[in-house]
UniProtKB/Swiss-Prot annotation:
It is found in: Golgi apparatus membrane. GO terms for cellular component: Golgi apparatus; Golgi membrane. Substrate binds at D331, D333. It comes from Oryza sativa subsp. japonica (Rice). Residues 607-637 are annotated as: Disordered. This is Probable xyloglucan glycosyltransferase 1.
Amino acid sequence: MARWWGGEGRGGSGTPVVVKMESPEWAISEVEAGAAAPGSPAAGGKAGRGKNARQITWVLLLKAHRAAGKLTGAASAALSVAAAARRRVAAGRTDSDDAAAAPPGESPALRARFHGFLRAFLLLSVLLLAVDVAAHAQGWHAVVPDLLAVEGLFAAAYASWLRVRLEYLAPGLQFLANACVVLFLIQSADRLILCLGCLWIKLKGIKPVPKASGGGGGGKGSDDVEAGADEFPMVLVQIPMCNEKEVYQQSIGAVCNLDWPRSNFLVQVLDDSDDAATSALIKEEVEKWQREGVRILYRHRVIRDGYKAGNLKSAMNCSYVKDYEFVVIFDADFQPQADFLKRTVPHFKGNEDVGLVQARWSFVNKDENLLTRLQNINLCFHFEVEQQVNGVFLNFFGFNGTAGVWRIKALEDSGGWMERTTVEDMDIAVRAHLKGWKFLYINDVECQCELPESYEAYRKQQHRWHSGPMQLFRLCFVDIIKSKIGVWKKFNLIFLFFLLRKLILPFYSFTLFCIILPMTMFVPEAELPAWVVCYIPATMSLLNILPAPKSFPFIVPYLLFENTMSVTKFNAMISGLFQLGSAYEWVVTKKSGRSSEGDLVSLVEKQPKQQRVGSAPNLDSLAKESHPKKDSKKKKHNRIYQKELALSFLLLTAAARSLLSVQGIHFYFLLFQGVSFLVVGLDLIGEQVE
């Protein structure tokens, strides 16, 4: 055996194998491939035993080296996270210290009350945990002490607490838990039905097809764009932007390169920037494309009210808009493909009742960090399942605010853009639906854009997306009831579109998993079954991740992060429903038919240089008058989010209490969910600012 292990085979000594461990990237397959050396069994020799054994030894050593490298990398990553957390705590910068970090429209008083409630709940849970640990040490977890037979103040107090818990707290808590479970099951059934609808669409190959393939439909005659210019309808392209210094060039360039007759489309760059330097850069970019022969205009409002809705409304009031049949909207970070109009506008031909054609979003930075990966999962499900199913079966869905083509007649018939909510896109979609207009969703037409890379930006976006629908529901509920659409469409709008998907979802997510579940740990007489805590949420997460199969490794972080975001969504839903926060009240300013801004550019001129010299100083002087003391650009910071941090400690405390009740699944869920809240509370997800 010693001779065999030493490589002294019967046919002679084996060839020594040298493996340099300094190169951990060296493939194991290279070692295994080199086994068939002269004299080895693979080569027909009998002296390969010793050599093969030695190679196996070295391969095992190489694998161990690789494993050690991976462990070192994991340890390094853990140390980096710990160092970032330590810096965050040492800096002491919280979301309450900086008003700019709070979501727009969030009431400071509401935020303070909500945070106070969470802190009080946390202190109470810590106290109850201490009491339960002391009682567990006395053995009272196995035998409930008799109130009449106990001796000692603590024993009497604990026996009284058990009685109050059993007779007064448990029934009410169990009722709330059962109610939330019912809502959870209803929402899960809705999600399952949407997935089945998407599966049916895939199996049947259902998708909108233009009735006519000529002209803009991409038919044989569409290759020669200029020759068939008469068949291409007039299209107005709008790019609303505000201080979009980073992306204005790519969005304007992508729109100006659209494959459409230049005489048949006009680009409006709607600049609401309050920074004079940014406005000058955008204006210069517009003039550059004007010199290239593109029909493009630059608009800058003097009175910037109504945010995006006000900007779009002002642009639609221009007198030349009456010459156009369709309007396309692209946000400043969107980059449409050259054939975007050819693949969307033809769907209107022969469908006079179609008011909107919506394209899908794709994301250029979906793999930037964990936050963008999780956002990609959510939005892939939104477009692939929700939008597609609602478009095919109901001809209605929420307009996404960009990458969509509107029939101008439908916009005007629905009342145009309104500044009454923070979700002007959903507002116009609901009003158009009440007027009887149909929507088409084109899943195979994609438009690239960017995802928020920092948690602060994502938090603000989600707050607006979940407060606005509740505002809109309050404003249009009576209009829905009085409208002439069918009963089923009214039911879909009220109960599915608004209540179930915009109100019930954030309500039960936060209440059930962040409040009721921890409470059941301290009041164990009220129970939440394991299938509610683990199995059904895992199944729903699996369904959500199916449209983005490459994101399957992130299914657990996705489930935990969605529950973490329920705090922001719940707070936003309450703010919008009860109109909390002064920023929600937008003043509606009516506009005249023709804009009178001094720096509004007219149609394309032959001498753009004179136009630039004459208008740029006016823009600078206007900016100086409006903002005489312009602050320098604020630096970005990572900060501590107090509500998320308080909830993390609450859930971790409840996880510790679940160990006393020997509830394994509940313990692991609370532990991982508490860690998830801790990571988000310390702003360790998303962009890290050094």
